[in-house]
């Protein structure tokens, strides 16, 4: 029975020409069989054969996975493992074992020839797994990280925090990290744990008791004292009596506190000067404002005087016309002539005041009374024009001259 698979394998190799290295088989090979010697796997391309054992059906697709040269070898393998255990339904073979078996000289290049040799020697399928593998399997399954690697990873994670002498941002669960010790007092024989102390004491590595003690024995047997200004230990010679700060730092501290202050006399003098400057500035502002107000008032009085003068002139002219009409309502021609003469005299006076000569040829038609009145006021008007400061008085005299001219005209009408 054991020679049949080898003969079938040889015939299959001759038929298909696979005398050289056979093609690689699939890594998963389902092998199912219950019968002791009658069961076999046959490959047929034209017929579909269903092989049922223990309720499992082998489909044609699973049979097609086998190469043509291995059909007889598969039948021999089923015959070999049929007597081993009825419960071995699935078997997995690493690729390295398959290639090592395929490279053997026995079996004529058959990759499953070692099964036939084991069966001939009287061994079973279980003895195959008890033999040590020839080569390491190609499959690799990562195992769990060892405890040493975990410790290194946790140590690297704790180094992310800042080492400032107190708890870091990522404190470890088990307390302080590897190689790091809690801060302790540097006094000789104290070694107090400062993990729960204040930040100041942890930073300078001194407990609260020794930071205030007058004499502390430090490393080396030196008698020192903790300076609160320098935040370190000094020899007792550098302190004054029972002071908590050294002599040098205490002198600097007192110098800053006792800076020289200005005397009261100097301070009062500065205040007086500031007040004097302030009062002078206010006086200057008041004087400038009063000057501006005086200029504005003078300008306003000039404008008002000019307005009153124009009003008086208009009233005088209106009064003269009314008187003329009341005295001689019939002599309209003579009254018009007199009005023209009066206006001519007024224009002549205005021209003389501004320095413009007026022709005297037209003055022959005037009455002697009017000529005398005009000539008597010419000198005074010229003098007033030469003095700009007497402008207001000049305007007043002009009003009086106009009134005198009207009175002369009124008297002339009564004479006629």
Curated annotation (Swiss-Prot):
Residues reported in the UniProt entry to bind Zn(2+) 2:
227, 230, 234, 246
Zinc fingers classed as SBP-type: ranges: 182-260
Q: Where in the cell is it found?
A: Nucleus
- Record key words, sorted: DNA-binding, Metal-binding, Nucleus, Transcription, Transcription regulation, Zinc, Zinc-finger
Known Pfam families for this protein? SBP
Q: Report, from the record, the phenotype seen after gene disruption.
A: Plants show upright attitudes and the absence of laminar joints, ligules and auricules in all the leaves including the flag leaves.
Chain intervals for the UniProt region annotation (Disordered): 11-51, 250-299
What the entry lists under InterPro entries is as follows: SBP-like, SBP_dom, SBP_sf
Q: Where does Zn(2+) 1 bind?
A: 185, 190, 207, 210
Q: Which GO terms describe its cellular component?
A: nucleus
**Stretches with biased composition (Basic and acidic residues):** 261-273
Motif (Bipartite nuclear localization signal) on chain: 243-259
List, in alphabetical order, the Gene Ontology terms for molecular function in this entry.
Answer: DNA binding; zinc ion binding
Instruction: Describe tissue expression.
Output: Expressed in stems, leaf sheaths, and young panicles. Weakly expressed in ligules, auricles, and leaf sheaths at the basal region.
Q: Which domain of life is it from?
A: Eukaryota
Q: Where's it mainly located? A: nucleus
- What role is this protein assigned? Probable transcription factor that plays an important role in building the laminar joint between leaf blade and leaf sheath boundary, thereby controlling ligule and auricle development.
Q: Enumerate the PANTHER family for this protein.
A: SQUAMOSA PROMOTER-BINDING-LIKE PROTEIN 4, SQUAMOSA PROMOTER-BINDING-LIKE PROTEIN 8
Per the record, what about its domains? The SBP-type zinc finger is required for the binding to DNA.
Q: What is this protein called?
A: Squamosa promoter-binding-like protein 8
